[in-house]
């Protein structure tokens, strides 16, 4: 019998990525205080890559404790802007200020995934994407935030590339799935190796 896969996430886009790839899974959303963990790691000068990995692992571990024998997938995405971690904006004003700072600049998205099985990590990967934002006018950015706030409030950096946010960028260097928050190709390779999916 195949080991079941559990997605430890409430993210609709991550669930959709697995569904689109025909990966059988169930969801169990962990209740974790991400902001406290992030703050503690930042206080220790942890780099953004390590923070993404630690948050993904924390989610997988929490759900793995409830489901022995299952493979539990935890994911997290962070935005590294000039060595500074940007999170989901807490207000339209924050989103606008951060977008103005990133206008005309490069930043990096780091998408971490960790699989736990029987209380132990068995696989992990952090994918990275480098993005360059166009030089955008303040009036365009103000309108963009006003039009898209209900959606972008749930996205690191205040944009979604699968929506109007794609217009903010001049170049994107990296895997599209990592932009969406999951290193899907690497995950599928591991699941095929373990016999969770047919190849």
Curated annotation (Swiss-Prot):
GO MF annotation, one: nucleoside triphosphate diphosphatase activity
Keywords on record: Cytoplasm, Hydrolase, Nucleotide metabolism
Protein's cellular compartments: Cytoplasm
Enzyme class: hydrolase
Cofactor: a divalent metal cation
Span of the signal peptide: none
PANTHER family named among the record's database cross-references: BIFUNCTIONAL DTTP/UTP PYROPHOSPHATASE/METHYLTRANSFERASE PROTEIN-RELATED, BIFUNCTIONAL DTTP_UTP PYROPHOSPHATASE_METHYLTRANSFERASE PROTEIN-RELATED
Family to which the UniProt record says this protein belongs: Belongs to the Maf family.
Protein's UniProt name: Nucleoside triphosphate pyrophosphatase
Organism taxonomic ancestry: Bacteria, Pseudomonadati, Pseudomonadota, Alphaproteobacteria, Rhodobacterales
